[in-house]
Curated annotation (Swiss-Prot):
One of its GO terms (cellular component) is cytosol. Keywords: Aminoacyl-tRNA synthetase, ATP-binding, Coiled coil, Cytoplasm, Ligase, Nucleotide-binding, Protein biosynthesis. Disulfide bonds: none annotated. This is Valine--tRNA ligase. It is found in: Cytoplasm. Belongs to the class-I aminoacyl-tRNA synthetase family. ValS type 1 subfamily. It is an enzyme of class 6 (ligase). It holds the Pfam family Val_tRNA-synt_C. The gene is valS. It catalyses: tRNA(Val) + L-valine + ATP = L-valyl-tRNA(Val) + AMP + diphosphate. GO terms for biological process: valyl-tRNA aminoacylation. NCBIfam families: PRK05729.1, valS. Signal peptide: none annotated.
């Protein structure tokens, strides 16, 4: 076995260890334990993983490794998503950057799809490489791509089944239309942004000479205007859409327009006659109480149009230019150029009454940033009412549990306000809709054209063409929990463990896709398999930068996990952040900000430091500000663990132990009791998905209890003359270290494996990897009767801390020996001083420990208080008296502050009445301790 390196260098072993794990098959499902399945939200094949991916994947991997160590049959299902719209955008942009003149249209459908497959192979390799570098312990032989044959067959089967059940239909309806992508997008892909715009008031002339009495009043109800009008005034933020108006609407109870219910309007600029209709939708108090109705270009107007059977006039082409349904002079104009012409002509005709600034919500596509058009087109839809009702029942009955539980409210809101789902997209990349049309436009749905012809008796003389649209990405993603397990093919289901691994145990994902993906998986899995997709849904916050800003390519604040793991120069980081921008003009600003934040680039931290940082930041219910400084701190933590292991190995050279140690010292009993408690705490934190508390618990045990205290407290025994105590301490040192490595392994797999390989043989532990060792359990060590040891060592720690604080404040050199006088104290204090005299002398560099007799005057000394015991370090030859007076005054002020805090709590009736009795009693005990300390400090101050 190779000797442990003198310094911690993760780059020297992380990649080597991962290759060993994978080649040995340690990540494959195995064992006879209960199944534990985790679904990876498949990352889009649109580039590389970002910190959000690394965040969630680290937590998933910790869960998988933890359960693998507990003997579960673990399956972590990984793969990638084809990401229709996003991928087409990326590949189209790359074609433009290549400068060969190739575009989506010049290549044609087959040629373009071939380019996408080429790019997918490249991107998919990058994603898997990143995941491996992070330490992902998934079975890569089961990795699935949503466009692979098996999941593609599942998509077709799902579509056909829902179509045959009447849940999928084709219809003409308004959809969100992106005129740049030239496809429909979902409501959740639209961002409503408040922007400055205008509100234009326009006269709509009444037809056939109809008039009405128009009256206006001031705020006090006094009449200010009365006149006969032959027009209505309508306000709009989109005057170009008036070319598609098919009605004007007033409230049925609005007395101002009671005589106009059967009237007609001569629509300006077109000459068309449109009716005045009445509908409760109108807000009489807003504006003039008259509303234009454009059913083909407004979602609310569309519903009005359906109620009143109004014609739907589509004004736009797929690129949002004016089509042939408008007067000839507008045809071919961009929508904004058409707006200018409409306003100009209205003004010339004297029909433009007023133009005023107006704040409005503008719908923009989340990918292109373009204004989205409500657009009338033929699309495929899924009826959602029945599916959503069942999906809500499954969550509210507890069959699917959200963690934290408050996310159920978000889920419920979406499910109770659900609309039919538009599943078709006007793209080439994706699962093509399994529907064929004959020349008469009749539609046939089936698994393939041959089945369609056979089912419907269509001979070769009947020409069929397949629908050119593809299904939106989330349609295939909703099948992920069971399509990856072979559904619907019986043989594949048996081979991939469908019956064993569904439902999965937990889904770890962000709140931003609860409806996009989580809800749809619940509905689809229940519909097609009769089961829930997963038992738990652990919702994480979003990763943000150190300033709380969302990480995005356009902001230039994205961090690549590999750059944190392996490091990157400032020049390479700038190049990475400024290349391939959708808005190239942002490059200069991004470069400036990057050079300011990372003047020397990013140092290599290793995968374990990044993983531990992520766990420590994973609080419930909040977004996470990622601070690179934390990663630096946890790199130091890994280094501390490395050095503690080197200490243990050096002090156990040639030793061989087995089994559980039989402790000979209080120090050993204390650390074994702490280990037992920490094992129980760790399991509870895993059960509750409290990775932050898990990291805190393990950090404090490793750094404080083991490295800082046990290693120091063990040195007197290790170097002492009592052989039994020395051997026992060596055994305990190795035993606790090995258990600590197992406790840490799910969070920091690489460093723990490298160290465990050195430690395990000295304990007679067999096995070639820590990842398949048992996770520590409460009761591995019988710690009954160790409570006294815990109390003793806590007392010893308090003594050492108090004296070290005095030495530090007095600036006593570490090597200088001092004398310690003890005053007062209980019988327990006297017994403990006698029992731990050698440790106290060793740890505190004491030349002597003496007790002051009752009534004996203490020399001028620096004082510290531990419980009832006063610790005195004579000042002669150590410090100047003025400095000690200042120190005591400062310490008195600190203790007085603590007393004030205790009194504040105990003086609060709410705290005393509502807090657990043990907590109140603990606070009273703290007050008593602080008061005792204050008395001693004041007495010492008086002596000076």
């Amino acid at each position: 076995m190779t000797q442990l390196a003198s310094s911690y260098d993760p780059s020297s072993f992380e990649s080597r260890l991962y290759a060993q794990w994978e080649s040995a098959g340690h990540f494959k499902p195995s064992g006879s334990g209960e199944p534990y399945t985790v679904l990876l939200p498949p990352p889009n094949v649109t580039g590389t993983l970002h910190m959000g991916h690394a965040f969630q994947q680290t937590l998933m991997d910790a869960l998988v490794r933890y359960h693998r160590m507990r003997g579960y049959d673990t399956l972590w299902q990984v793969g990638t998503d084809h990401a229709g719209i996003a991928t087409e955008m990326v590949v189209s942009r790359n074609l433009a950057l290549e400068g060969k003149g190739e575009t989506r249209d010049t290549l044609g459908r087959e040629g373009f799809i071939a380019k996408v497959w080429e790019w997918k192979a490249q991107s998919g390799d990058t994603i898997e490489r990143q995941m491996r570098r992070l330490g992902t312990s998934s079975d890569w032989s089961r990795s699935t791509f949503t466009m692979d044959p098996q999941p593609s067959a599942a998509v077709t089967e799902a579509f056909v089944r829902w179509y045959e059940q009447g849940l999928i239909y084709r219809g003409q309806r308004l959809v969100n239309w992106d005129p740049v992508l030239k496809t429909a997008i979902s409501d959740l892909e639209v961002e409503n942004v408040e922007e400055d715009g205008f509100l234009w008031s326009i006269r709509y002339p009444l037809a056939d000479g109809v008039t009405y009495e128009h009256v206006e009043h001031d705020a006090d109800g006094v009449e200010t205007l009365r006149e006969t009008r032959d027009y209505l005034v309508v306000a709009t933020t989109r005057p170009e859409t008036m070319l598609g108006d098919t009605a004007v609407m007033v409230h049925p109870d609005d007395a101002r327009y009671a005589t106009l219910h059967a009237a007609q309007i001569v629509l300006p600029l077109t000459g068309r006659l449109v009716p005045v209709i009445t509908d409760d939708y109108v807000d009489r108090a807003f504006g003039t109480g008259v509303v234009k109705v454009t059913p083909a270009h407004d979602f609310n107007d569309y519903q009005v149009g359906v109620r009143h059977d109004l014609p739907l006039i589509n004004l736009f082409t797929v690129t949002a230019a004016i089509n042939d349904n408008a007067p000839e002079r507008y045809r071919g104009l961009d929508r904004y150029d058409a707006r200018k012409l409409v306003l100009s002509e209205l003004e010339d005709l004297g029909l433009l009454v007023e133009t005023k600034p107006h704040k409005l919500q503008v719908p923009r596509g989340d990918r292109t940033g373009q204004v989205i058009e409500p657009y009338l087109t033929d699309q495929w839809f899924v009826k959602m009412d029945a599916l959503a009702k069942r999906g809500l029942e499954l969550v509210e009955s507890g069959q699917v549990k959200f963690v934290p539980p408050n996310w159920i409210n978000t889920y419920r809101h979406w499910m109770e306000n659900i609309q039919d789902w538009c599943i078709s997209r006007q793209l080439w990349w994706g699962h093509r809709i399994p529907a064929w049309f004959d020349e008469a436009g009749k539609c046939y749905v089936g698994h393939d054209e041959a089945q369609v012809r056979a089912t419907h008796g269509l001979g070769a003389e009947v020409a069929l063409h397949q629908d050119s649209d593809v299904l939106e990405t989330w349609f295939s993603s909703q099948l992920w929990p069971f399509s990856t397990l072979g559904w619907p093919d019986a043989q594949a289901m048996d081979e991939r463990g469908f019956a064993r691994y569904l439902p999965s145990s937990v889904l770890v994902t962000g709140f931003d896709i609860i409806f996009f993906w989580v809800a749809r998986m619940i509905m689809a899995t229940d519909s097609f398999t009769g089961q829930v997709p997963f038992r738990d849904v652990y919702i994480t916050g979003l990763i943000r930068d150190a300033q709380g800003q969302k990480m995005s390519k356009s902001k230039g604040n994205v961090l690549d996990p590999l750059d944190i793991i392996d490091g990157i120069s400032i020049e390479d980081l700038v190049a990475k952040r400024t290349s391939g921008l959708m808005q190239p003009r942002m490059a200069e600003k991004i470069e400036k900000a990057t050079r300011k934040e990372f003047p020397d680039g990013i140092i290599a931290h290793g995968a374990d430091a990044l993983r531990f940082t992520i766990a420590a930041l994973a609080t419930h219910g909040r977004d996470i500000k990622f601070d690179l400084g934390r990663a630096e701190g946890y790199k130091n933590f890994c280094n501390k663990l490395w050095n503690a292991t080197r200490f243990a190995l050096m002090n156990t050279e040639g030793a061989q132990f087995s089994g559980v140690p039989q402790p000979q010292t209080e120090t050993e009993r204390w650390i074994l009791a702490r280990l037992d408690a920490v094992a129980a705490e760790a399991q509870a934190h895993y059960a509750n998905y409290r990775f932050d508390l898990l990291a805190q618990t393990l950090y404090e045990f490793a750094w404080n209890a083991f490295c800082d205290w046990f290693v120091e407290l063990a040195k007197p025994a290790l170097n002492g003359a009592v052989q039994d105590a020395a051997d026992s301490t060596r055994h305990t040192l190795l035993y606790v270290l090995e258990a600590l490595l197992r406790l840490l392994h799910p969070l920091t797999p690489f460093v723990t494996e490298e160290l465990w390989q050195q430690v395990a043989p000295r304990l007679g532990i067999t096995g070639d990897t820590i990842s398949l060792q048992a996770f520590p359990q409460r009761g591995d060590v019988d710690t009954s009767g160790y409570a006294g040891a815990e109390a003793d060592i806590e007392w010893l720690k308090a003594m050492v801390s108090a004296l070290r604080r005095v030495r530090s404040e007095l600036n006593v050199p570490p090597s200088k020996q001092v004398r310690l006088w003890l005053q007062a104290g209980s019988s327990d204090d006297r017994a403990r001083v006698a029992r731990f005299a050698s440790q106290l002398a060793f740890l505190l560099k004491l030349e002597a420990i003496d007790w002051l007799a009752a009534g004996q005057e203490a020399p001028p000394a620096a004082a510290a208080i531990v419980g009832e015991l006063t610790l005195l370090v004579p000042l002669e030859g150590l410090v100047d008296m003025d400095a000690e007076r200042t120190r005591l005054d400062k310490e008195i002020k600190r203790v007085e502050s603590e007393i004030g805090k205790c009194n504040g709590k105990l003086g609060n009736a709410t705290f005393v009445q509502n807090a657990p009795a043990a907590v109140v009693e603990q606070e009273r005990a703290r007050l008593n301790d602080w008061t005792t300390q204050l008395t001693g400090l004041r007495e010492q101050r008086a002596k000076l």
